[in-house]
Amino acid sequence: MSPQTETKASVGFKAGVKEYKLTYYTPEYETKDTDILAAFRVTPQPGVPPEEAGAAVAAESSTGTWTTVWTDGLTSLDRYKGRCYHIEPVPGEETQFIAYVAYPLDLFEEGSVTNMFTSIVGNVFGFKALAALRLEDLRIPPAYTKTFQGPPHGIQVERDKLNKYGRPLLGCTIKPKLGLSAKNYGRAVYECLRGGLDFTKDDENVNSQPFMRWRDRFLFCAEAIYKSQAETGEIKGHYLNATAGTCEEMIKRAVFARELGVPIVMHDYLTGGFTANTSLAHYCRDNGLLLHIHRAMHAVIDRQKNHGMHFRVLAKALRLSGGDHIHAGTVVGKLEGDRESTLGFVDLLRDDYVEKDRSRGIFFTQDWVSLPGVLPVASGGIHVWHMPALTEIFGDDSVLQFGGGTLGHPWGNAPGAVANRVALEACVQARNEGRDLAVEGNEIIREACKWSPELAAACEVWKEIRFNFPTIDKLDGQE
């Protein structure tokens, strides 16, 4: 017998293929406080038992491969393997199951969302034994959370920087999103900020195109910020999109924003990538910049109910990677968003401790151990008639981000901003007086129209606008 054969035999190696469930399905396993827990929606191929499918997910996202290998004997699989510890059927779905998987913490590099996702949502999503696979939720243990910096500043620090309390913040995305010159773009920024908004915003696909190079845009927007601040006495900001083709270029743009003295920059965190996002978040914390996050590309990943990844997971990942704002849907606007599910991940963004609540899609209790919170941004097809609902749904710690709902005002950009601000102030005052925004919202807006012609004009323009389409990604049991 050759020395190599003797080595393989001595570690108990037996070539061949064995069922995943013999090693990776462990219903007797008691999860540890340090485990990362995952809830997967599994749709096995016909003939594949759910236990085998769940075990395959645990194996292929941790230590397993398609066949037995002799190097298994050179490490402790019991220490490092993922374990499918529970499987439950999905109500109303005969072919779908929720498989719960526990991962030992040592499988993941500290402070790296990139590494965590490479394992948990990597090659396993193309596994042939599965017709579809979706990651519904993750439990991030405090031991892992503490290896991340998280948001550069967080909700309270942002309010202190801006000196704005007791109400949602107001924003506006400059439109048209592409094609304006830098000077005309800066003019629109100035008019919106002067009219009463707290922020204006680059659209997600505004980077540095031939019609408007980034440096010109930054300069004209900075001028607009300082001019509007001088005229209103309020602190203003514009989300300057630093997203670029390389991390080095992205940081260069953030450095220039800091040199201009503006308060906030922006990043497209999914198209830019988690490594770039975490690097930018670290820079922003070290240099006093707030960081606005856009979620462009999220619907490619999260919209289909049986495959991909739910946005609550992307939201948790962003809180770890770092961002002070993130777009979170509106419930009432033009973009996808179920109310209970949206409120669930809004709490996961803002709160320090969130209890398990399956009625809102929260599969695990999440303790953030004082990691700073993230402001959810409601954006997409909203206007003044939505203000009572938005104020009631999202509360004070949020950003209500208009676009066409400001710039589409018949009298111009500044009157559009005035209408937004008046509607918000009316809703906040009514709420503070004990009125029910959900019931009396339209009446509150009509009353405010009596002393704001700008709001009255906006209400007339958008009184018939509706986006009455069913939500595709509903919580189980809501069909």
Swiss-Prot record:
The basic functional RuBisCO is composed of a large chain homodimer in a 'head-to-tail' conformation. In form I RuBisCO this homodimer is arranged in a barrel-like tetramer with the small subunits forming a tetrameric 'cap' on each end of the 'barrel'. Its main location: plastid. The gene is rbcL. Residues 1-2 form a propeptide. The modification Phosphoserine is found at residue 208. The active site is at residues 175, 294. This is Ribulose bisphosphate carboxylase large chain. PROSITE patterns: RUBISCO_LARGE. The disulfide bond which can form in the large chain dimeric partners within the hexadecamer appears to be associated with oxidative stress and protein turnover. The lineage of its organism: Eukaryota, Viridiplantae, Streptophyta, Embryophyta, Tracheophyta. The record marks 334 as: Transition state stabilizer.
